[in-house]
Structure formats: structure tokens, C-alpha cells
């Protein structure tokens, strides 16, 4: 059974004027390696820590500024939100299609809230806590191309023509602000699009981004802004002592107009200085150590890296299943081809390398979790190929071969073929990232023994479910397994309304 909304009644939760307060007992374990009976033993000790959560339920008017607004992802997301807001339907060769938010965790997935008369009861994910209605988001942003959003939508060739015609009047007046352009960080083939760029030294570029955010916020009368990078994949930045290793050195490097500071890092720097959440949707190392240090010191939310949309999402499910079933993946070969601008940019070796790193690390935590299957340091062979094929456009093709060792020396091979519209997978993920980033800024918590409430760590690991290479606070384990990431996110939001984690034990029926 599906219910639209619910209210929690419990001594552990209190609904007040503009906020929800909850008390939550976090059940975890503590491991110690100690001498017992003359030898070292591992001892696991159950541990309970009481937390208090406080969530501001006043939902703000939200502005979203996209870096790369005129690209396939930015134009597709903007078009999709307008189509939903206006209730637009359009004719395809198969049917009359209604606008929807399919593919969005927050808008189109559900959570289990209990059982009633022997039937499982589910509710929308978004019913857990008050979230921004995506129909009410105000969009803006930057792009190195000055093409308006209606023409950019046509250039992307993602949405049906009938829908494009209906959306054009809404999008023709939407024109991106000039963006930061450094040809050294992206493929040379992007130069033909770069007719809308911010001139001047890096310090001046950062100030221009700050001014743009302030002017957008004032002009559109929005209470909060979230900035998200959905522009070209950049090459990796060199990590250099004295350049970007500390906050102080990074700021000094900007003053000197050092070449080895990427455009994405400049956008992130501007957002941190302005106290605006910044999410990186591409695989490059935007968050150099100096930026992370600065975000932590200023308590300004940063998240990323790289949208987890198609092939990698499947991989983080399948490898988790195989290793969890006691099957040993020994070879993973992933091949992709696509024909959109992302594919063209990735045809350059230096930008492909960023994507290769992002895709390659996705199985690491699953492999290291099973010392029965893998010796220390052992890892499956993992090869990734991406090719640019202009004819297929946004229709990305992904082929994967998983070879595993099974019982008594046997072999198992699984082959997957996945065809999808790349931007139609990415757009709802962008939506989820900005909605959850905004929501997380309204949640505060404190553990027993702490005197004051505080926000989540500014390095927003809560966004891991949506990222190929999750950014986590220093010293925090990286989790890539999709089911664990979703459970983490859902259970944190459940804790905010005093609900226990969903553990699927269903003991009442055992």
C-alpha cells in the first residue's frame, strides 16, 4: 500500500513552530585489539550513542546556478522542471507523454514506513522531511557559450521536438552569464564554443562569480542559492606544495594568478568565500587540499564528485552483490561510446584520465571488505574505455563484462549492455543533489556530551549515493556500494523524525 504522507507520534520527536526536534539512539560497535589469555584478540563491543537532531522546516525559495547551464545536462534539467511546473504534455511516436520526475530519488522513490494488516506500507521519499518543491526552483548560471537555453536545448537533441516547441517561449530569454574559460584544462575541441568568457586574472574572475551570485540572489528574490558544476570534465590539477596544498597557499596562488588553478576550483573558491553550497558533478579533482581546508574552516558545504548515473551505478550494485554472495570478480571491462559534447571533450587523453580514475575506484571498498576472496593488495583487473561516436548523440552505449571465480575453480561471465539517454539520467541526479544539499543545511545535530548543535560536516558525504567518487571528510571511509549509500541517506533522514533505521528484520512476522 502507498500513502502520500504521514506524521510520527513518539516521545522521541517533537514538531514545533518551524522545526522538528528528535532524539535518536545510534547503535554501533567499537572494535579493540587487546591481549586476552596471552594473545591478541579482536573484540567487538556494542555501543549506543544518543543524538539530538533539529531540522528547520521553513522551506526557502531556492535558486540553482549551474556552471555549464547551456550544456546538455543544464538545458535538459531546466526544460524538465519547466515542463513539470507548467503541466506540459507532448506527443511521441508511442503516446501522449506527461512531464514527470522519474529517475529522481527525492521525487520518484519511496520508503517503507511499516506494515498494516499484513501489508507493507510505503510513502514518498520526499515525505520524510520538508523539501523544496522542484517546480519552484529558479535557475540561472554560467556558460562559455552565449547560446540561449531554448537554442541550447535544440543543440542538445535530447528532448522530443513537440516538447521543445512548447518549451521554447519559456527558455528563449534564459541566457547564461559569461563563464571562466581556461583551454589548458579541457579538450581543444571546446574552443569553438567559447564566445562568452570572463576576462582578467583569477582573483578578478573569482570576484566576478561572487558578484554574479549576489546579483542573482537579489534579482530573483531567492533566499538560498546552490551552485553545481555540470560543465566539461577537466584534466586533473597537479597537487603542488606551496600552490594548492593549504588554504593560505591557494589564496596566495590566486593572488599571483598561477596557471595551475582550474576553473572549477575557482568557482568552488568563490562559493566557499560566499558561504554558498557547491557541488562538483564532474570527475576532476576540483577540491584540492587547500579548498577542502577552507570549506571546513568556513563551514561551507561542498560535495561531489561526478554524477553516478548509468554504468557506474550498475557496477556499484553488481559487484556488491557478487562479493556479498562469496563470488570473486577477477576482471571488469567497461566500454562506452557516446556522441554528445561530453563525449567529444572526453576524447582528449587528459580529460579522459579524470573520468577513468573516477570510474575505476568504484569497486575498491567492496573488494577490500572480503579478505576470504582477496589477498591484501589483490584487486580485479579493471579496464575502462570511452569513445566518441558523433552519430549516437546523447544516446550513450555501455557494455560491461564481469568475469568471476566461482566454486571449485569455475568461471562465471556476466555481460551487460545498457543504452540510455545520458542527460535524461543525469538531470534528475542534479535535481536530487541540489535539493539534498539545501536540505542538509537546515539540519543540525549534537551527540551526547556536546553542548551545542552543529551542522553536518561541510564535506557532504550525505550526497554519496549520487556520486561516482564520493567526497568524504578527511579520515572517513569511502563507501561506494549503492545499497549502503542509500541506506545511509534514508536512515539519517529517518533519524531526523525519530524513526529507527530500516533494518528489514521484520521480526514481528518471524
From Swiss-Prot:
Cross-referenced InterPro entries: Myo-inos-1-P_Synthase (IPR002587), Myo-inos-1-P_Synthase_GAPDH (IPR013021), NAD(P)-bd_dom_sf (IPR036291)
Task: Report the leader peptide range.
Answer: none
Binding-site residues for NAD(+), renumbered to this chain: 70-73, 143, 180, 190, 193, 230-233, 281-282, 306, 309, 340-342, 355, 393-394, 422-423
Q: Which GO terms describe its molecular function?
A: inositol-3-phosphate synthase activity
| Pathway membership | Polyol metabolism; myo-inositol biosynthesis; myo-inositol from D-glucose 6-phosphate: step 1/2
Q: Look up the record and name the cofactor or cofactors this protein needs.
A: NAD(+)
Q: Which domain of life is it from?
A: Eukaryota
Q: What reaction gets catalysed by this protein?
A: D-glucose 6-phosphate = 1D-myo-inositol 3-phosphate
Task: Please list the GO biological process terms of this entry.
Answer: inositol biosynthetic process; phospholipid biosynthetic process
The protein's Enzyme Commission number: 5.5.1.4
Expression induction or repression: By abscisic acid (ABA).
Per the record, its GO cellular-component terms are:
cytosol; nucleus
Which keywords accompany this UniProt record?
Answer: Cytoplasm, Inositol biosynthesis, Isomerase, Lipid biosynthesis, Lipid metabolism, NAD, Nucleus, Phospholipid biosynthesis, Phospholipid metabolism
Localisation per UniProt entry: Cytoplasm, Cytosol; Nucleus
Q: What is the predominant subcellular site recorded for this chain?
A: cytoplasm
A single Pfam family, by name? Inos-1-P_synth
- Similarity comment text for this entry: Belongs to the myo-inositol 1-phosphate synthase family.
Query: What is the annotated role of this protein in its UniProt record?
Result: Key enzyme in myo-inositol biosynthesis pathway that catalyzes the conversion of glucose 6-phosphate to 1-myo-inositol 1-phosphate in a NAD-dependent manner.
UniProt-recorded name of the protein: Inositol-3-phosphate synthase
Native species of this protein?
Spirodela polyrhiza
